[in-house]
Amino acid sequence: MGSPNSLFEVESFLKNMFNDPLILGIKNTFARKMLASFITHSRVEETKKNYQAIGGKSPLTAHTLNLTNKLNELDCKRFYTYAMRYTPPFAYQVLEDIKTQGIQSVVLFSLYPQFSYSTIASSLIDAKAALQKLAFTPTLYEISSYHTHPDYISCIIERIKESLGADNPNEFVLLLSAHSLPQSRIDEGDPYQKQCEENKEVIQKALESEGIVFKKIALAYQSKVGRMKWIGPSTKETITKYKKHKMIIFPLSFTLDNSETEYELKILYASLAKELNVPQYRVCSCFNDNERFAKSIMNILEEHLRGKAEV
């Protein structure tokens, strides 16, 4: 979806995000722009402070670039690049470059493992609109969900084991923290929450198959905005609930570190854990340009192309 590459991009990032009809769910363009402007104005300074706390920008773009570089190193058969939804590089710019190169087959691969209309569908619509504007008609494939794929799950298990080290898992609560969504989106049929729950079950089985049994594996949701009801329980509530236990946090809905992992999990909720005297609070890093994750993308891609027709 993108993140600000500097404090100067924070305002435009927020405007672009809240003006997306799949984010606010308002079809009337004028009304949506007015509300997006109001929300942006009310949040921009606080958001800038959050980014200042992690160095003045999101690490997302750098991690994404490093991942695509890793993929290009590992797979000489294809050209890997990336586009963002709300900050540069936008889909139009990237697809224009791909068209110029004479590439005739394009795979749209989401770096969100679980499907949601607010994130993945929005990005796919944006990319297809760009293709139409460019009069570019490549053979098109899309990979929009892989939350239970064994290669992806193995990357998660590796990160959890790294965080656990030689310690006894039975002394820890494993908290899988996913980005939240408004409850109304789930009620309308968005499969995101169901896929997060499926993701949790597969992770638990994979850990148990290796003899790794945590005191508790909990699923919670972070990053709520506004007053409407969002899916829960919240990450804050769950940390508070298990405050007497050692805790490992895994960022379930992110494959690349960003403000939600670097600020919310590693600063905001780490501070909460300290206030609550949580015995140990550890946050797993996202995969970023980890070679195992890059190879899992390649494997998922290969399997998809062997078994699926074009869009």
UniProtKB/Swiss-Prot annotation:
Q: Which residues bind Fe cation?
A: 179, 260
Which cellular compartments is it found in? Cytoplasm
**Gene Ontology molecular-function annotations:** ferrochelatase activity; metal ion binding
Keywords attached to this entry: Cytoplasm, Heme biosynthesis, Iron, Lyase, Metal-binding, Porphyrin biosynthesis
A Gene Ontology biological process noted in the UniProt record is: heme biosynthetic process
Class of enzymatic activity (EC top level): lyase
GO cellular component entries: cytoplasm
Q: EC annotation? A: 4.98.1.1
Q: In which pathway does it act?
A: Porphyrin-containing compound metabolism; protoheme biosynthesis; protoheme from protoporphyrin-IX: step 1/1
Q: Quick one: where is this thing mainly located?
A: cytoplasm
Query: Can you state which reaction this protein catalyses?
Result: heme b + 2 H(+) = protoporphyrin IX + Fe(2+)
Q: InterPro entries given for it?
A: Ferrochelatase (IPR001015), Ferrochelatase_AS (IPR019772), Ferrochelatase_C (IPR033644), Ferrochelatase_N (IPR033659)
Cross-referenced PANTHER family, in alphabetical order?
A: FERROCHELATASE, FERROCHELATASE, MITOCHONDRIAL
Q: Which family does it belong to?
A: Belongs to the ferrochelatase family.
Function field: Catalyzes the ferrous insertion into protoporphyrin IX.
Q: What is this protein called?
A: Ferrochelatase
Species? Helicobacter hepaticus (strain ATCC 51449 / 3B1)
